[in-house]
Amino acid sequence: MKLLNVINFVFLMFVSSSSFAQVIEMNNSSLRDFVTWYSKQTGESVIVSPDVKGTVTVYSSDVKPENLRDFFISVLRANNFDMVGSIPSIIQKYNPNNQDYIDELPSSDNQEYDDNSAPSGGFFVPQNDNVTQTFKINNVRAKDLIRVVELFVKSNTSKSSNVLSVDGSNLLVVSAPKDILDNLPQFLSTVDLPTDQILIEGLIFEVQQGDALDFSFAAGSQRGTVAGGVNTDRLTSVLSSAGGSFGIFNGDVLGLSVRALKTNSHSKILSVPRILTLSGQKGSISVGQNVPFITGRVTGESANVNNPFQTVERQNVGISMSVFPVAMAGGNIVLDITSKADSLSSSTQASDVITNQRSIATTVNLRDGQTLLLGGLTDYKNTSQDSGVPFLSKIPLIGLLFSSRSDSNEESTLYVLVKATIVRAL
């Protein structure tokens, strides 16, 4: 009977000690796995910052449940990370501000940390004066406001803070002192505003050098006056050989210009792009070919002569337009515009593909609804063609009587018309 009591006592002591202490052994385990283990052990919700990466090595023979949080934070600190906030807590890069030290970790011994970066003099215990709160963003993407909110928080406190976004529900998760969070909604109301959109309508075309197009019905009326750039009230003189090659026009110049170009045999419309983008966001459109260019070739000892090795890089060749518009409060539009018109050359003088490149890149200030004309990019094409009667054209001396040679010179100028219109937010 006494022997049975002793066995029961030893069994109860073993179960009791197992329920109050844990043996933790981790060798080069992922830091995220360590966080997952802690969350399962304590039942706490934890948000992990994207910059939390690395491994951790921990050996501990006696960690009691009431000391598990302090133990977990100490391991994080030893690896230059930290856990801040209440529920949910946030794992982030360690910030030494707003931390207290104690000489030793209570009720936990035989612990080893494989990291020389751990600060000497004791363990860390955070001051839990940060509060974690979520904020619903209604008009812009939450991730676009992270840097702005971080600036607001850090300019009002020197304590540790963190700002994350939840893209699926468009939320901001902010961990900061409570007085900062109380003032944050008022600040968010000044930056969480509806954003205007900009409609960019373009017309990329080329005309033969010296030819003038009759645009008088498009720009000669009162609605089509020139707003600036050249001293004329008719788009015809702007596009003629005697006129300039830039200008800003009021009225529906773009739409009527398309009709005039279609009826002129000496003009060619290359592209009519339409781009709708948010103010402050880049928009682009392109059409063309993806052409391979040889960037390297090996035919020596390291490669089979019958099957030489070469590297190829593909690049887009065609018509493209890229814009970056910003709508101002007064109705102006600051517009960064880049337009390219690339084509493949018919020349066979080179061993690889030759491309003809024409591009315009500029920054302009337009009023809502105005049309901008840019141009003056001239392209020269010289072609020669030999033809003759087969066999007879190869006879010496008299062969010239049965052959002919034709040379042609083409000269064209590229122009770009761009109209910017503000689409007000509802």
From Swiss-Prot:
<comment type="function">
    <text>Acts in the assembly and extrusion of the bacteriophage by forming a channel across the host outer membrane. This channel is just large enough to allow a newly synthesized phage particle to pass through. Extrusion is a process of concomitant assembly and secretion and takes place at specific assembly sites where host inner and outer membranes are in close contacts.</text>
</comment>
<keyword id="KW-1188">Viral release from host cell</keyword>
<dbReference type="Pfam" id="PF21305">
    <property type="entry name" value="type_II_gspD_N0"/>
</dbReference>
<dbReference type="InterPro" id="IPR038591">
    <property type="entry name" value="NolW-like_sf"/>
</dbReference>
<dbReference type="InterPro" id="IPR004846">
    <property type="entry name" value="T2SS/T3SS_dom"/>
</dbReference>
<dbReference type="Pfam" id="PF03958">
    <property type="entry name" value="Secretin_N"/>
</dbReference>
<feature type="transmembrane region" description="Helical">
    <location>
        <begin position="317"/>
        <end position="337"/>
    </location>
</feature>
<dbReference type="GO" id="GO:0033644">
    <property type="term" value="C:host cell membrane"/>
</dbReference>
<keyword id="KW-0472">Membrane</keyword>
<keyword id="KW-0732">Signal</keyword>
<keyword id="KW-1249">Viral extrusion</keyword>
<protein>
    <recommendedName>
        <fullName>Virion export protein</fullName>
    </recommendedName>
</protein>
<dbReference type="Pfam" id="PF00263">
    <property type="entry name" value="Secretin"/>
</dbReference>
<keyword id="KW-1133">Transmembrane helix</keyword>
<comment type="subunit">
    <text>Homomultimer. The channel is composed of 14 G4P subunits that confer a barrel-like structure. Interacts with G1P; this interaction results in a complex that spans the inner an outer host membranes.</text>
</comment>
<comment type="similarity">
    <text>Belongs to the inovirus G4P protein family.</text>
</comment>
<dbReference type="GO" id="GO:0099045">
    <property type="term" value="P:viral extrusion"/>
</dbReference>
<keyword id="KW-0812">Transmembrane</keyword>
<dbReference type="InterPro" id="IPR005644">
    <property type="entry name" value="NolW-like"/>
</dbReference>
<dbReference type="InterPro" id="IPR004845">
    <property type="entry name" value="T2SS_GspD_CS"/>
</dbReference>
<dbReference type="InterPro" id="IPR049371">
    <property type="entry name" value="GspD-like_N0"/>
</dbReference>
<dbReference type="GO" id="GO:0016020">
    <property type="term" value="C:membrane"/>
</dbReference>
<keyword id="KW-1043">Host membrane</keyword>
<dbReference type="GO" id="GO:0009306">
    <property type="term" value="P:protein secretion"/>
</dbReference>
<feature type="signal peptide">
    <location>
        <begin position="1"/>
        <end position="21"/>
    </location>
</feature>
<dbReference type="InterPro" id="IPR050810">
    <property type="entry name" value="Bact_Secretion_Sys_Channel"/>
</dbReference>
<dbReference type="InterPro" id="IPR001775">
    <property type="entry name" value="GspD/PilQ"/>
</dbReference>
